[in-house]
Amino acid sequence: MQKKAIIAMSGGVDSSVAAYLMVKEGYDCAGATLKLYDNPQCSCPGHRACCTPSDTEDARSVAARLGMLYYVFPMHDEFRHSVIDKFADTYLHGGTPNPCIDCNRFLKFSALLDKARELGCEYIASGHYARREQDPETGRFILKKGLDPTKDQSYVLYAMTQDQLAHTLFPLGSYTKKEIRHIAQEQGFINADKPDSQDICFVPDGDYASFIEQYTGQSSEPGDFVDKEGNVLGKHKGQIHYTIGQRRGLGISAPESLYVCGKSLDSNKVILGGKQDLMSTCCYINDINLIPWDHLDKPIKCKVKTRYRQPEQPATVEQLGDDLLKITFEEPQRAVTPGQAAVLYDGDMVLGGGTILPEGLASTK
């Protein structure tokens, strides 16, 4: 019996070729676009965000060319609750979030899977550069890096559950981006040469602080820049304007370069220091998801990424509680930022990950 699949179609070249490859493999496919956010800025020239009206039309065009049914699922409320609210709350509490991880976690691989099941489909498929396999010994599904190291997206997929992995396919996992564009051109897809989306869809101009102030109705109060000893160095514009490791835009004159090293929410102070003050020997993460196992029974040695484009770093990871891991780096790491994801790897296999906690908060978890 022909297996059915819903293809998550963003209107970009990757998801379009994913749809083509699924049809070529013999799946009974339908395309689906999640309507997440309406922002007039997203349609402006120069912005490279997803979820624009033209993206929907591009997806519809490709689906028609492949002879597939095509759906648009409005999910504005779910997106607002699961992604934007969390994004704003994390910034207001001193962190720097990655909303694309939450969009994948709660919408693309959760809400869309629910829709697929309602339509009688066994699988969803996406244009992410990642691979998924089943361990023959344990029966668990594992997540692996895409073979193209320049496009691998496994970092933003670490939160996928066993159920989601069991019902998700990644047709592009063994391809390079160059090969994908070549296939799209061969098939005459309207979006074959379309640039990749890079901006956050609901903040296409990159001005996170203004968006959060407008979205929440809360202004970020100015306060003091201080050094490690508490000496006042100047005035900041509001904490949401700054992230750990930031050097530019501080407006502080000093003999040596200063960086944002921390924030004190209680006193509304932003702490500045030198490069050496950005280094961390360990961090703690919560909201964890482990893929090959349910729990770490003993410390493990692995590689860790604390930012999307960061090279993996050797570390030891141990589980301290049901929802708490401690990561100890072999070498101190620069600008380990609360709110970002720390993702664990063993070779090309994703072991899991979680959200980096502010210093001093782990003991309260």
Which positions does each model-derived feature cover?
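AMP-forming adenylation/ATP pyrophosphatase catalytic core
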Residues: 125-132, 136-365
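ATP-dependent adenylation/nucleotidyltransferase module used to activate substrates
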Residues: 1-158, 169, 179, 185
